[in-house]
């Protein structure tokens, strides 16, 4: 995987181009996921994202796929600005922190309704982040005091199915675990959806012509 930071630069024109938009609560791990994939470095300090974009290139079947990865702000203050970054999205990554049940609930209660309103028909992948913290004793004990527990893989998978997501994946940006697989899946889903829509339009046009 070859990645390059975007500082206003455009993705190369050769090969396929895919726009990936990350959505989720502030602090859920989506920025770290993007930065580890695009730059190979985990950010040790948390700085709330406004809006960021990175370019990265994947090789799929020997051909380059250029990803435009948009990281959106999850804070309420940016509710009016966030929809400006949805147009032309090819795939949406709805992210949550597996150690934060509230961010998990917000995928179905907040983020799914928002993206389906602004991005009708765009495929969704649900991503559980920070899986390395599932076994953090201090964090788990703090959750137990509130009668809570980390979100399990099966709960994440079931929720993803309930919102009609095409896939559910988990990752740890800190450990670089499954990070590339998330974006590989995003690229494959986006390109598959694009091919499906192309042939559907061709079929519809043929039917209209007969």
Swiss-Prot record:
Name of the molecule in the record = Rho-related GTP-binding protein RhoD
**One of the Pfam families matching this protein, by short name:** Ras
Which annotated residues bind GTP?
24-31, 71-75, 129-132
Its organism's taxonomic lineage begins at: Eukaryota, Metazoa, Chordata, Craniata, Vertebrata
Residues spanning the membrane: none
Q: Which InterPro entries match?
A: P-loop_NTPase, Small_GTP-bd, Small_GTPase, Small_GTPase_Rho
Quaternary structure, from the entry: Interacts with PAK5. Interacts (in GTP-bound form) with DAPK3, FILIP1 and WHAMM. Interacts (independent of GTP-loaded status) with ANKFY1.
**Alphabetically, which GO biological process terms does the record hold?**
actin filament bundle assembly; actin filament polymerization; cell projection assembly; fibroblast growth factor receptor signaling pathway; focal adhesion assembly; lamellipodium assembly; positive regulation of cell adhesion; positive regulation of cell migration
Organism of derivation: Mus musculus
């Amino acid at each position: 995987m070859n990645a390059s930071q975007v500082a206003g630069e455009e993705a190369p024109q050769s090969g396929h181009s895919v726009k990936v938009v990350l959505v989720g609560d502030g602090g859920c791990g989506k920025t770290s996921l993007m930065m580890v994939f695009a730059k190979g470095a985990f950010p040790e300090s948390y700085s709330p994202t406004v809006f960021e974009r990175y370019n990265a290139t994947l090789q799929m079947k020997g051909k380059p796929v250029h990803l435009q990865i948009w990281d959106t702000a999850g804070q309420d203050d940016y509710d009016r600005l966030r929809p400006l970054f949805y147009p032309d999205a090819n795939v949406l990554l709805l992210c949550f922190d597996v150690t934060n049940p509230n961010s998990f609930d917000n995928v179905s209660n907040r983020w799914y309704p928002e993206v389906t309103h602004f991005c009708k028909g765009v495929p969704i992948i649900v991503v559980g982040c920070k899986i390395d913290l599932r076994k953090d004793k201090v964090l788990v004990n703090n959750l137990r005091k509130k009668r809570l527990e980390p979100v399990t893989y099966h709960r994440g998978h079931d929720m993803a199915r309930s919102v009609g997501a095409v896939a559910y994946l988990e990752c740890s940006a800190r450990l670089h675990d499954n990070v590339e697989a998330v974006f590989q899946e995003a690229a494959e889903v986006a390109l598959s959806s694009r091919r499906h829509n192309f042939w559907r339009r061709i079929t519809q046009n043929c039917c209209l012509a007969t």
